[in-house]
């Protein structure tokens, strides 16, 4: 019975945690891959060089790589 209640509490905790990530990749033009030189931060519009990382004002940690931009929350919020 004790294990049952622990599993219920653990399941509730997992269900209320939220994590958010998003990213973007360069789109091909006329079927040709376009080499990525910079990434544009969607939060403030600033350009960032490839292989750079930065933190946004709204708690996202972003990284620009040759395959695109990826941003994730720096923490997990409880709903």
From Swiss-Prot:
Name the keywords, alphabetized.
Disulfide bond, Secreted, Signal
**Signal peptide span:** 1-19
User: Is this entry keyworded Disulfide bond?
Assistant: yes
The cellular component terms of Gene Ontology attached to this UniProt record, alphabetical and capped at eight, are: extracellular region
Major subcellular site: secreted
Q: Which Pfam families match?
A: PSP94
Disulfide connectivity for this sequence is: 21-72, 39-64, 62-71
Where is it localised?
Secreted
Look up keyword Signal and say if it applies. yes
State the family it belongs to.
Belongs to the beta-microseminoprotein family.
Query: What is the annotated role of this protein in its UniProt record?
Result: Shows an slight inhibitory effect toward the metalloproteinase brevilysin H6, but does not inhibit the metalloproteinases thermolysin, HR1A and HR1B.
The name of this protein is Small serum protein 3
Q: Which organism is it from?
A: Protobothrops flavoviridis
């Amino acid at each position: 019975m004790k294990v049952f209640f622990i599993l219920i509490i653990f399941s509730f905790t997992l269900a209320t945690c939220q994590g958010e990530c998003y990213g973007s990749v360069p789109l091909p033009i006329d079927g040709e891959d376009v080499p990525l030189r910079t990434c544009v931060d969607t939060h403030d519009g600033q350009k960032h060089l490839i292989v750079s990382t930065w933190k946004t004002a709204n708690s996202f940690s972003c990284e620009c790589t040759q395959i695109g931009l990826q941003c994730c929350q720096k923490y997990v919020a409880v709903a």
